[in-house]
């Protein structure tokens, strides 16, 4: 590493990578007053959407709402650049409702670049970081043992420039030694058309951080002018008035477009079966694990062999481009077969392929090497966020970027990190899963991963997290005032509904009974009326039982709070009970290998992950309830021994 006399520049924080994690991290640290540099291989591809040009979906939309509630960027940009919006799972309960936006990918990137360029304390740099500079110091630990401490000092670029930093956040996405595959042909690339990040993986190994290999993929893009749309089902934009962001100033002025639906055919399936041996996975060219919840079309045909057809979505990539993203049709087959495959789909019989599908292999850092703050256990002040931690998706990346950015600044300020619990957020659920589970495939957030999904809805993310965002310093005064006003209106409306009664003799009551079939016996409150499954806030408006024109978000929040009041109270009680048990801390210096009352698997996994508390320990694979009980007993015995030792020392000193 170069001498510090040749330092080009010095920063408080350096962020490596300009994807969705890197942008959130850099904006966060800069907004909190720390000089920040964002390094990326290509400044023209910042916050690019190399796979589907969309934000949101089940659980992912909840993540976006949470990032926005804390003061992040992804929700605002998704709202401003959306060219189609839909509510998914609308026929089911509010725990799984999900907003999904089709975005204009070029507009999204353009707006993010503008934000970065106009953020105080933030510099953009085009360079490939190949080396991390680490300072090593010896410290005296427990039992007077010497401990080697490692701390980040700076970074070095491919061409030899050195930049010093007090903290570094790695957000390299799929670029670490990335290699893209089409059939049995491959080339070094982070994604199509962009070079891979070389050298940093080897450096990570040298400084004590392990990496492994994962795979993902993206489908072909076809020219919309070559599609026969009359043969397809139309999927219009149906939720243009719904927003990810809680900021009342965010608006969408983009034209709205439709997506279209086609399906695979028997000819599609046969062509895939005949050519499986030519794909990177089935041909044995690579063996990295791909995402379970976003499989290639060949995986679908093999794993669901009895299924006659699979739905395929045709999604526009923007307003001013002819490119259509063929969602659900990613593949690693050779290019000529890809075109043949596409032309077996209804509506695509004469399609022109603009970009082929490809698979991409890349290095990632297993997140069991991270603390809950996303700081690495091995090196102080070094953080890691996004797809490099084994996740998949822009939303997961953005959430991690914000967390890493917040905690990097808190570390520099000598403050405790902000820890997101499973009970508080999907952010907490995701991070807890990442750092406690030995994942071998790309991780995607799902509503089924959360035990508290009725509490962790998208509509109440601001109620759960905006006070924290304000406390951190990411929510400005204007936004905070808007939040407080919303909370007041929400509580006032719930109070009004609880204290306004209807008598069965009232004319409006007779009308409600006649039209809804809901009998009103004696009298009832508007709250009790709203609790009924076939009565909604829109009915209050219909029967002129609303006092003022409240925004749709307040109407929705009031109705959910009232309709699910019993369930929400029960879940709150469960959370409080779990918190009392799970918050008991576990000292980091414990050597679990020496606790003979634990199972061998529990000893190994506990030593590897080093959980901070019993809650984290309970979620580690291989750690049973019996192991947790044994650990609790061991800790009590340890505490008793310490107390006895202290008493003995005190007696000796006083004698």
Swiss-Prot record:
Q: Which SMART domains match?
A: GIDA_assoc_3 (SM01228)
Q: Where does NAD(+) bind?
A: 290-304
| Matching PROSITE patterns | GIDA_1, GIDA_2
Q: Enumerate the GO terms in the molecular function aspect.
A: flavin adenine dinucleotide binding
What Pfam families does the annotation carry? GIDA (PF01134), GIDA_C_1st (PF21680), SAM_GIDA_C (PF13932)
Residues annotated as binding FAD are 17-22
Q: Which GO terms describe its biological process?
A: tRNA methylation; tRNA wobble uridine modification
Among InterPro entries, the record links this protein to:
FAD/NAD-bd_sf, GIDA_C_N, MnmG, MnmG-rel, MnmG-rel_CS, MnmG_C, MnmG_C_subdom, MnmG_C_subdom_sf
Q: Which domain of life is it from?
A: Bacteria
Required cofactor names: FAD
One GO CC annotation = cytoplasm
Its annotated function is as follows: NAD-binding protein involved in the addition of a carboxymethylaminomethyl (cmnm) group at the wobble position (U34) of certain tRNAs, forming tRNA-cmnm(5)s(2)U34.
Concerning HAMAP family, the annotation shows:
MnmG_GidA
- What family does this belong to? Belongs to the MnmG family.
Q: How does it assemble?
A: Homodimer. Heterotetramer of two MnmE and two MnmG subunits.
**NCBIfam families reported in the protein's UniProt record:** mnmG_gidA (TIGR00136)
* Protein's recorded name: tRNA uridine 5-carboxymethylaminomethyl modification enzyme MnmG
Q: What is the lineage of its organism?
A: Bacteria, Bacillati, Cyanobacteriota, Cyanophyceae, Synechococcales
